[in-house]
């Protein structure tokens, strides 16, 4: 793989974990998967039932989990020689918290974030998997996590916009936006190969868009 550290991003249902796992297996990469299970973040299911009450708790718990995981994983790897692929980029904490928290809570949260993650390496390439909301909802229903089944279209749309707003502000990263609405890289090997080939192209720092 051309890049030593790749982060796959997107909203829930975009296929981040599946793609990251397949690439790590095919390229003998070190895989970092986000820890989101209810036993890791006990506030997650409660948040989907009562967002206003549990938003701050769920975001702070994710912040701590992501920091500890990346600190442990990246600290034991050689970023110049190992190939590392993750199914998230830490900035998703800011994107989700901006959507979920009140303004005063977000201000406090972002201060914590900037302190904690100031020394965590950025990926050489961030890949954003774009799917329209209908595709996302289909995938969410298909995988059947109980706490995700009540997610509304508007919430996914706001998260998508949050990602786009974040991406526009990044001037020092390679970011690849892949529109995967017309392919199925999970079920179709040829589509998966097309995704890998797109990721493995040489990109300058900046934003790049491809429709597959």
Locate predicted features.
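Hydrophobic anchor at the beta1->P-loop junction of P-loop NTPases
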Residues: 8
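P-loop (Walker A) phosphate-binding loop of NTP-binding proteins
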Residues: 11
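Conserved lysine of the Walker
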Residues: 16
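Post-Walker A alpha-helix
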Residues: 19-20, 24
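Conserved substrate/cofactor phosphate-moiety recognition/catalytic segment
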Residues: 25-65
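Glycine-rich phosphate-binding loop used to anchor ATP phosphates in small-molecule kinases
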Residues: 54, 58-121
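NTP-dependent small-molecule kinase module
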Residues: 141-150, 154-212
């Amino acid at each position: 793989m051309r890049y030593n550290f790749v982060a796959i991003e997107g909203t829930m249902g975009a296929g981040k974990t599946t793609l990251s796992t397949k690439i790590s297996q095919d390229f003998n990469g070190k895989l970092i998967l986000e820890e989101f299970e209810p036993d890791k973040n006990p506030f997650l299911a409660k948040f989907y039932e009562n967002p206003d009450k549990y938003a701050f708790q769920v975001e702070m718990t994710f912040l701590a989990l992501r920091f500890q995981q990346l600190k442990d994983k990246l600290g034991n790897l050689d970023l110049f020689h190992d190939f590392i692929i993750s199914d998230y980029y830490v900035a998703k904490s800011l994107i989700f918290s901006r959507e979920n928290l009140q303004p005063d809570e977000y201000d406090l949260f972002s201060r914590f974030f900037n302190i904690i993650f100031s020394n965590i390496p950025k990926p050489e390439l961030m890949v954003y998997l774009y799917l329209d909301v209908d595709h996302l909802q289909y995938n969410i229903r298909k995988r059947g996590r109980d706490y995700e089944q009540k997610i509304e279209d508007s919430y996914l749309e706001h998260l998508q916009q949050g990602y786009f707003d974040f991406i526009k502000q990044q001037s020092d990263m390679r970011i690849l936006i892949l529109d995967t609405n017309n392919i199925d890289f999970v079920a179709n090997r040829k589509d998966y190969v097309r995704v890998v080939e797109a990721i493995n192209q040489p990109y300058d720092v900046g934003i790049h868009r491809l429709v597959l």
